[in-house]
Amino acid sequence: MAFPERFSNLPEYAFPRLRALLDHHPAGGVPVAMTIGEPRHEMPPFLAEVLNANIAGFAKYPSNEGIPALLAAIQGWIARRYDVALGQEQIMVLNGTREGLYNAAVALCPERKAGAAPVVLMPNPFYQAYAVGALALGVQAEYVPARRDTGYLPQYGQLPPEMLDRVAIAYLCSPANPQGAVADAAYWRDLIALAERHDFQIFADECYSEIYRDTPPPGVLQIAREMGAHPERVLSFHSLSKRSNLPGLRSGFVAGGPESIRRIRQLRAYAGAPLPEPLQLVEAA
C-alpha cells in the first residue's frame, strides 16, 4: 500500500519526546516539572456553575458560526484590549488555537505565488502546528532564526527580496514561546509594512498576550488598524488555555479579515468540528 511522503520527515511531536527524556531521571531530589506548560492555578470557580447550568447543550450539534453571546463577548474583549472594533463576521470560535493555526494555512495559502511554490515563514524555535500546515500543503517552509543576536524574534525583512515575493504566510508568536520575547509596536509596524510590500498574510499567534508584568504587549490588530493595512493582511489567534487556566477547554478564537474568516469557517464545515455550545457559554462567561 502506498502512503504519502509529505510527512515522512515530521519528527515525533515535542511532548512525547520530552516525556521520554524526563522519564529516566535519577531517584531522589525534588522533581521540577518540565513537561507540558500547563497553568498552575485553579480555573475561575464560577465557570463550573455555567457549565452545569447548560449541560443539556451537549445533546445537540453546535453551530459552526459560534453562538451570538460568545461572538459578542469576543468583540467586547478585542475592543477593550486593543481599541479595535470588529464585526462578528471577522471572528471565528476555535477548538483551541492549534486548530486555527493549521486550518488557516490550509484554507488561505495559494497554490502559486510569484510564479513558484509559495513560502511559509516561521520563527525557529517554532510551534509544530506552523510547520505541519506547510508540509500538508507541500509548500516551502522557511525557518528563520530567533536568537539572541536577533532579539529572540525572527528578522523576516533580512530575507532575499526574491524569496519575500514568494511568501504567502508569515507566522509570528508574541509574546514568544519559548523565548519570552515581545514584538513591540515598531516590530509589528515593520512586519506589516513588509507584508504590504510583498503581499503576504501575517498569522499572529498571540496566545500569551495576557502574560506580562507591567505593560500589555501591543497586538497585531491594533497596529494594522493604525497603519491602515489591507483588511485581510493579518489574523490574530487567541486562547483561553493560558490566560484563564483552561487548557482542557480547548477554546480560542481567530480574528481578522472577513474573507479570510469565511474561508477558514468553510473549511471547518467540511473537515472539523465546532466547539460544543456549553463550552462556548463557558468561554463567553
Where in this protein do the model-derived segments appear?
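Helix C-cap/helix->beta junction micro-motif
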Residues: 25-28, 137, 197-198
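Walker B catalytic acidic pair
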Residues: 206
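N-terminal small-domain helix-loop-helix segment of the aminotransferase-like
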Residues: 4-103
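Conserved core of the PLP fold type I
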Residues: 59-193, 210-211, 215-228, 235
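Residue-level marker for buried hydrophobic side chains located in beta-strands
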Residues: 202-203
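PLP-dependent aminotransferase class I/II
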Residues: 233-285
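Glycine-rich "substrate-gating" loop/helix at the edge of Rossmann-like oxidoreductase active sites
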Residues: 4-9, 179-181, 241-242, 269-272
